[in-house]
Amino acid sequence: MITICIMNKCSVCCGITAALLALASCNSDDLSDDSYYTFKGETVATYIENRPDSFAVFTQIVKEAGEQSLLATYGHYTAFIPTDMAFETYFREHNTSLEQLTLEEKKDMVYNHIIRSTAIDYLTKDFTEGALGTSNMNNRYMIISYIASDEGRNQIWVNKQSRIVVPDVELHNGVVHVIDHVLVPSDETLGSILDQMPAYSIFADALRQTHLNDSIAETYDMSYVSPYTTEFVNILGYTMKPLQQRRLGYTLFAEPNSVMQAAGINSVDELKQYAATYYGSEDAADPTSRRNALNRFISYHLLNRQMSTNAFIYSGPCTSSYYMDKRYEYYETMLENRLIEFKAGNRLNEQQNARFVGIDESASNIDGMNGFIHSLTDMLVYDETIMQQDVLNKRIRFDAYSIPPQLTNNNIRWKLTNLDGFGGYTMSPDYCGDYFRFNDASKFIMWASDYWTNYQADEISVRGWYDVTVRMLPVPPGTYEIRLGYSARSWGGIAQLFVDGDIIGIPVSFNYTGDQPQIGWISDDQTTDNGAENDKMMRNRGYMKGPNSVYAINGQKTLRQNVGSLRFIVGTFTFQDYAPHYFRVKNIESELGEFHFDYLEYVPTSLIDSEDKD
């Protein structure tokens, strides 16, 4: 259990004594006593303005940046406010002064310290190791770390640069955390940062030789032009916010030299030999070739989405309590068509013998301008035999939002359950590129709720004369059953399904709930065999109950216990090669019909008879 030095919100009647005790226990900078109080009706703006002995410099920067009204307005602001002593240190270390800061630098300084959320004030009780769920006003994430002091107390650090000395000052429009250093986010790429880390010199050299550092350097896709001219649009009577920019992001996993050396690798040349044992000898003389072994080795360490260590695995309330330690995710790496598996605890590619590659949390979450660097505890490779016969030889369930990296990089996935003032998001048909395409007639909605019967709270709802194509995760060659997870609704409509361009069976009715005779759902507790025979009967009709591992707060049931939570068996498919596969759904009945898209599953056919209910 982590013990954190925290002082809760105080009222004036608590007295000066309580404030002084908190000051001593948190070992804070030289703050005025009233910095520890929360006065009724104060905003973030008035809180800092009313304490010139502690926050005069930040207050002045806010005013000179023209942002006086920002922290005074209604909203949900989480402000990490540096003390005046923190600014003294910053000015001295950067050989500058308040007067020398440009207007742009002042705005950046304000935005670097403020998170503006639609509904959340981030209190320390909500912190976990890694990034906070909402980026700051400069689209950079606040990285939280817990570091023990010399006295053995766990202290909270932000961006590994600044310590929180006064936490959780709750105010009318947000919360203030007082910090002891000015936050200075890196403006360098991940490759440039790695070049400055001597402990990773072998990996950094390999990254340079492959030129893959150039592939992870961009921050925005400047080729994307949004067709939207307003902040909000109306879709089916709902207020939706269209995605206007396409931000890019990356995650880089790197073995430190110590891990390399433990594997007998002391130079890039030796790393090339090591990589060749897994990835072959094609184009051996050209490390920039995507077929080269070193290039493939490095590519498998890269994701085209930025994620901190607490962002790989879903952590919301829609997982059954018994299944928390069994949670998993699958992501396609930048080694084309090759997946990496994450399990709870950030165990990468865990084998049946319990061997896995871990992440060294203390050396990870290195924040660059467009992503994160994480340190590995063992060598990470895509071993064809192990991945096909062990790691990926299982049911692979993946949420709809996990497919396009654009939904992660632009703060959509797992971020929609606490919106205020609008219902969700929409996007243009080309926003997600090849990952997700739909026609202009599609009325496309992305929204979420912890109280709906969804796999990870998120859902996609499409109406109109829709025609939607999804690039499913690539899997190893083999024979798989593919399933669609959805919620059956009376307005579901009828659609034709396709896989890899081929029409699949007859049209599917998404408006049948499970208890209708076409499906035949019977609650497990109404059977004598815990639903075993009913499962067989439903499979014969092309359906399955929802998974027991997913929990719905509203109704206090798992999806298996919910009559409207179904899996439709799309069919059985044999894939000869590694390649992307495409799932298409086309409305053929009425523009009022809905396609509800929650998740997809691949299941090796050899495992179906022994499959669990999770």
Indicate residue ranges for each PLM-predicted region.
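Acidic/histidine-rich, surface-exposed loop or edge segments in extracytoplasmic proteins
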Residues: 35-44, 84-92, 184-189, 274-280
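Extended compositionally biased segments used for macromolecular assembly or nucleic-acid engagement
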Residues: 210, 215-237
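Sec-dependent bacterial lipoprotein signal peptides
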Residues: 1-24
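Aromatic/histidine-rich interaction motifs
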Residues: 92, 97-162, 270-359
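Post-signal-peptide N-terminal segment of Sec-exported extracytoplasmic proteins
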Residues: 46-81, 85
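Extracytoplasmic
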Residues: 347, 379-614
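Bacterial Sec-dependent N-terminal signal peptides
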Residues: 20-50, 97, 176, 190, ...
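FKBP-type peptidyl-prolyl cis-trans isomerase
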Residues: 58, 80-90, 170-185, 253-263, ...
